Each structure stands twice: as structure tokens, then as C-alpha cells.
């Protein structure tokens, strides 16, 4: 595992809760994007910010690094990959080092008084893949994981770790467009099926005719799921 300076600080965009903060959500963007860009994209789709009365949303930005699919060009990516395909090895050195960095972000929330069981991790595309590595390998005690248009490689170390058993398995919420021509729908479905076979409680929503993008239906389904995993302090709390 590559060493990561303890001083690494990820730029982030934060949407504060409208009421008392009692839970946190970390939303990881896709390759080449940014935390601010992810927030603005969601705001454009919903015609408003994704907000909650009690949940703080954190949109961090990945560091700029050489990215092999861009022939070594610099891009804001959570990790490197040899190509965008299920059928290749994972670039574990970069994945593991970023797990360390993002663990620091989780620790920051815990230090403010938020229990790990009140933290959700997820993301779009590469961000969803990163979230699965982070949660299932390093932080299995989080409230859940969400993946939008993402996948794991066929021989992912995530599967290898889960095969060992004896650990908590956060619930997985997954959405994928049926017309996705970058990250194929079949890749997302296969990832979901494999994790389910390893004991993960999963849901998978196919979005008809949706390419590699977000839509309102998807985000509304996500918001409903978030509230089942991170409910407010009272049953009658309005969102």
C-alpha cells in the first residue's frame, strides 16, 4: 500500500442540514469531475439542492493524478485504472492509498460526534466503486453504500475480502441506466448479483433508456433510501 501523507486534505463542498446535524453522507464524484460539480449536477437535475433536515452532505474532490485511460493525462480521479472494463486487474496501490485518505474524512465526522452507523458512503461511476472499496474493506460499520452507474472488476479484492466472512455488511443501493454505453448496465448488475451472493443486502434499480448520467427518478429513489438508512430523530420529522 502506498504511503499517504497524513496532511492530505481533500477540497470539499458541503450542504449543511437545515436542522440539527445527526448524520452525514459522503458523495463521491465520477472521474474527471469535482465535488462542486457533482453538487451542481444534482441541483440541475432536481431543480434544487439535495438537502435533509438532519443529514450533512459532503462532496469531496479527488486529487489530480495521471490517469491511464487518458494516456497519462491529469484528471481528478479517486484511483487509476488500466482501462474502463470489468476484465482487468484493479490498480490496488492507488485504490488503497485513497481509502486511507477518505478514511480521514470519515474520522473527521466521527470526531464531531457522528456515529459511524450514522454515515452513508456512495457515489457516481468511479465514485461508487471507490465507495464499495472504502465501506466493504475498511468501514463495514457504516450505515450503507450507494452506487450510481458504477461497477467492480470481476476479480475485485472486495469480493475476496467478503469471501472471508465474519464482518458486518452494509446494505447496498444501486441504480444503473439501461442505455449506459460507458459503464455497461450488465457490469452494474453483475456487481450487484455477486455482492448479493456474498451476503450483502442489495437493491438494484434499472433506469430505462438512461445513459451514463443521473435523472430525477433515480435521485428521488436514492433520497427515499437514504432516509430509511438515516432516519430523523422523530418519526414525524419532515424532510
Swiss-Prot record:
GO terms for molecular function: palmitoyl-(protein) hydrolase activity. One of its GO terms (cellular component) is cytosol. GO terms for biological process: negative regulation of cGAS/STING signaling pathway; negative regulation of Golgi to plasma membrane protein transport. It holds the Pfam family Abhydrolase_2. Keywords: Acetylation, Cytoplasm, Hydrolase. It is an enzyme of class 3 (hydrolase). It is found in: Cytoplasm, Cytosol. Its EC number is 3.1.2.22. Gene3D superfamilies: alpha/beta hydrolase (3.40.50.1820). The active site is at residues 125, 180, 212. Belongs to the AB hydrolase superfamily. AB hydrolase 2 family. Palmitoyl thioesterase that catalyzes depalmitoylation of CGAS and KCNMA1. Acts as a regulator of innate immunity by mediating depalmitoylation of CGAS, thereby preventing CGAS homodimerization and cyclic GMP-AMP synthase activity. Does not exhibit phospholipase nor triacylglycerol lipase activity, able to hydrolyze only short chain substrates due to its shallow active site. This is Lysophospholipase-like protein 1. The gene is Lyplal1.
Amino acid at each position: 500500500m502506498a504511503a499517504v501523507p497524513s496532511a492530505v486534505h481533500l477540497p470539499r463542498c458541503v450542504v449543511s442540514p437545515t436542522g440539527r446535524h445527526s448524520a452525514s453522507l459522503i458523495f463521491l464524484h465520477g472521474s474527471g469531475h469535482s465535488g462542486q460539480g457533482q453538487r451542481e449536477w444534482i441541483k440541475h437535475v432536481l431543480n434544487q439542492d439535495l438537502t435533509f433536515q438532519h443529514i450533512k452532505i459532503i462532496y469531496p474532490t479527488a486529487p489530480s493524478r495521471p490517469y491511464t485511460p487518458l494516456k497519462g493525462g491529469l484528471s481528478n480521479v479517486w484511483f487509476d485504472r488500466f482501462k474502463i472494463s470489468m476484465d482487468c486487474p484493479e490498480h490496488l496501490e492507488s485504490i488503497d492509498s485513497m481509502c486511507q485518505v477518505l478514511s480521514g474524512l470519515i474520522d473527521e465526522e466521527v470526531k464531531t460526534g457522528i456515529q459511524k452507523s450514522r454515515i452513508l458512503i456512495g457515489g457516481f461511476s468511479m465514485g461508487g466503486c471507490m465507495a464499495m472499496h472504502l465501506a466493504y474493506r475498511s468501514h463495514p460499520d457504516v450505515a450503507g453504500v450507494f452506487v450510481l452507474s458504477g461497477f467492480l472488476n470481476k476479480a475485485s479484492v472486495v469480493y475476496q475480502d467478503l469471501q472471508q466472512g465474519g464482518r458486518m455488511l452494509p446494505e447496498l443501493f444501486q441504480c444503473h441506466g439501461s442505455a449506459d454505453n460507458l459503464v455497461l448496465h450488465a457490469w452494474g448488475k453483475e456487481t450487484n448479483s455477486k455482492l448479493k451472493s456474498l451476503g450483502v443486502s442489495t437493491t438494484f434499480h434499472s433506469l430505462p433508456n438512461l445513459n451514463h448520467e443521473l435523472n430525477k427518478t433515480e435521485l428521488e429513489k436514492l433520497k427515499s433510501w437514504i432516509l430509511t438508512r438515516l432516519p430523523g430523530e422523530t418519526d414525524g420529522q419532515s424532510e
